[in-house]
Amino acid sequence: RRSGMRYDIIVLGGGPAGLSAAVAARGRNKSVLVVGNRWQDSPLARAERVDNYLGLPGVTGTELLEQFRRHAEELGADFVLGRVISLMAWNGFHLTVGSEIYEGETLILAPGVVRQAKYPGETEYLGRGVSYCATCDGMLYRGKPVAVVGRSGDAPREASYLKSLGCQVVYAAAKRPETLEEDIPFVQANRLEITGAQTVTALVADGAPIPCSGVFILRDAVAPTDLLPQLETRENAIRVDRSMSTSVPGVFAAGDCTGGPLQVSKAVGEGLVAALSAAEYLDRRGSEPPAGASSGT
């Protein structure tokens, strides 16, 4: 990635749809940043055999993803690994990934299927004790008791970061991760609830309250509709038109997040269309005269 650069297109998701979008966008000479988790974590990577991808019967999911990513890299797409914690739509789009902020003119959503039930109290206390990013908000809780809800591979590392700040950390999950520091208290729980008054006062784990000032819920991904609440959906999928445009200007979507069928070929095709539409959007906007400018005679 190129630090401090404002990208023409930021692609959220490194699966077939996102990588197809990156290839098509580079073909239109647009700068592209792909943000996602490790490609090995993609559902396609776990497919031992793919028999319905045109021209490549019997290919493994890993082989397909490796070819897709290599193609995008060779064309000059930039990549960053991490979870998108927040997204601000103002003068383009500003994405927070870990502790870094990336800027883009347009956004292509291709995160796959992100279904995640909210914990009771999560939405109510978001920003009032509930956070999705330890590196972003940890300093606010220096020296205070906090709970980490571990739902991602890097959650133990973020718990260690909070501990290094002087936070009194308790880690809650269905199973203790092997990489969790031994001196961080662990609570095994399947049912979690966040309670409080004006702000968070406790994480309730299987009925037992854990007093805390903050709860860090660390998932592998944040649902696009949580990042952009104004996104319109239909049957739990992002609503798009034939150009893969969403209800938010400058935002396009492709792949499994737009609904079924959940097929690689469909994702690749939609990624292509989304990138071409984003490029056309940029070109059209770039050709518009500045506000108040006279066309002359």
Residue ranges and their predicted role:
Residues 1-4:
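Short, Lys/Arg-enriched N-terminal segments with co-localized hydrophobic residues
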Residues 7-63, 144-178:
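Beta1-alpha1 glycine-rich phosphate/pyrophosphate-binding loop at the start
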Residues 22-23, 156-161, 166, 254-292:
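A conserved FAD-binding loop/helix module that cradles the flavin
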Residues 25, 44-46, 118-123, 139-141, ...:
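Short loop/helix-cap segments at secondary-structure boundaries that form the rim of catalytic
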Residues 66, 72-96, 102-104, 164-242, ...:
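A Rossmann-like FAD-binding core segment of flavoenzymes
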Residues 75, 79-143:
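Glycine/small-residue-rich loop that forms an oxyanion/phosphate-binding "nest" at active or ligand-binding sites
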Residues 118, 124-140, 218-265, 273-276, ...:
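FAD-site-proximal beta/loop scaffold in flavoenzymes
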